[in-house]
A protein has these predicted regions:
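Pre-P-loop entry segment of helicase/translocase ATPase cores
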Residues: 1-24, 268
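Walker A/P-loop
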Residues: 22-42
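Walker A/P-loop NTP-binding motif
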Residues: 39-51
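Conserved nucleotide-state-sensing and coupling region of NTP-binding domains
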Residues: 59-115
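Conserved RecA-like ASCE ATPase "motif II neighborhood" in helicase/translocase motors
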Residues: 99-155
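Two-metal-ion RNase H-like nuclease active-site motif
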Residues: 107-114, 261-273
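ASCE P-loop NTPase helicase motor core
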Residues: 143-207
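ATPase catalytic-site recognition across NTP-hydrolyzing enzymes
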Residues: 204-269
Length: 287
C-alpha cells in the first residue's frame, strides 16, 4: 500500500531512544502526527530488532484502551511478513493473549490502564525497560486539578518505580490539551527530554510535510475554530473567555497627541490575587 515518509522529528525521536537506554522522554506532538504509531509500534519494534528491549509496558487511559493500543504491535509481530522474513516468526502459541503476550525470542509486552496497579510487573528476570504512556489526559481529567495531581503522582511513583532503579526508557506521548495536565507536569519534571511538534512550524510550514499540506491544515483551522485548533494542533490550550484574541483587536495608526480634543486614561488595578485577574490593564481613549 501507499506509504508516507517519516518527518525529521519522528526519525530524531527513534534515534534518541535508540541511543539512550535510560531516558525520560515526552513527545508533545500535535494530533494526527503519528505519536501512537511511532512510540507504541515502530520504535519498540526497532528496539526489539536491535535487542535493546526486553519488557514493554503500554499505558492507556483505560485497560481496554491500553489493550487496543497494544494490539497494534501484536498484529505487526503476527502478520508483518517483512518483519517475519528478517527476524523470524514472532507468535508463540499459548503466550499470545490480549493485553499480554511474549514473542518467540522471549520479549514480553503488557498493557495497563490509567491508575491500574503496575507493581510487581516483570517477566522472568526482566523488569520493564520500555514504558510508554499514551494520551493519558482527557477533557474531563484536565478540568479536575485533584485528579491530575493524583495521576501525576501515580506516574512518577508507582509506574516509574517498575523500572529497574530508574533504568529504562520512560516515555509519555500526547498533545497538550490543558495547562493543568499530567503531560504538562511530566514535561516540567527535572531531566525530561521534550520533543514539541505543532502542526505548523515556526516558519509557517507543515511539520510533517509528507503527510499534510498547509492548505489542508488551514482548512482544519477554519472548521475547528481558533481555540480548538490551538488546543489540538498547536499544543496551546486556551481557556475560552480568559484571553483577548488577536482577531478581536483592530489596529490603526494613532494621531499626534495635539490632534485630539481630549484624552482619557483608565487603569483597572484588579486587587484580587487570583490568576484570573489582570492586575495591569490600562486603556487610553482619545477623541
Amino acid at each position: 500500500g501507499k506509504h508516507t515518509d517519516c518527518a525529521p522529528f519522528q526519525i530524531k525521536a527513534a534515534h534518541t531512544l535508540r541511543d539512550h537506554p535510560t531516558i525520560q522522554y515526552a513527545a508533545q506532538w500535535a494530533r494526527g502526527h503519528a505519536k501512537s504509531v511511532h512510540f507504541d509500534v515502530g520504535i519498540p519494534m526497532y528496539l526489539k530488532a536491535l535487542k535493546k528491549l526486553h519488557l514493554m509496558v503500554l499505558v492507556g487511559k483505560s485497560k481496554d484502551n491500553a489493550e487496543t493500543l497494544l494490539g497494534d504491535i501484536q498484529a505487526e509481530f503476527e502478520f508483518n511478513q517483512r518483519y517475519i522474513s528478517d527476524f523470524g516468526v514472532q507468535k508463540v502459541t499459548g503466550s499470545w493473549e490480549t493485553g499480554k503476550f511474549v514473542t518467540a525470542d522471549g520479549r514480553a509486552f503488557f498493557a495497563r490502564g490509567r491508575g491500574q496497579s503496575p507493581r510487581g510487573l516483570r517477566y522472568k528476570k526482566y523488569r520493564p525497560d520500555y514504558i510508554v504512556i499514551d494520551d493519558l489526559d482527557d477533557d474531563e481529567l484536565v478540568n479536575n486539578p485533584d485528579r491530575v495531581a493524583r495521576l501525576t503522582k501515580w506516574v512518577k511513583e508507582a509506574l516509574f518505580g517498575t523500572l529497574d532503579g530508574g533504568r529504562g526508557r520512560f516515555c509519555m506521548v500526547g498533545n497538550l490539551i490543558g495547562k493543568n495536565s499530567v503531560l504538562a507536569n511530566f514535561m516540567a519534571s527535572d531531566g525530561v527530554v521534550v520533543s514539541k511538534v505543532n502542526a505548523i512550524d515556526k516558519n509557517g510550514k507543515p511539520s510533517w510535510a509528507a503527510k499534510w499540506t498547509i492548505e489542508e491544515i488551514r482548512a482544519e483551522e477554519r472548521f475547528m475554530g481558533y481555540i480548538s485548533f490551538q488546543r489540538e494542533k498547536m499544543n496551546n490550550p486556551i481557556t475560552e473567555g480568559s484571553i483577548f484574541r488577536n482577531d478581536w483587536i483592530r489596529w490603526c495608526r494613532p494621531l499626534r497627541l495635539a490632534k485630539y480634543d481630549y484624552l482619557v486614561c483608565y487603569c483597572d488595578p484588579s486587587f484580587k490575587s487570583t490568576t484570573r485577574n489582570d492586575y495591569k490593564a490600562i486603556k487610553l481613549w482619545g477623541k
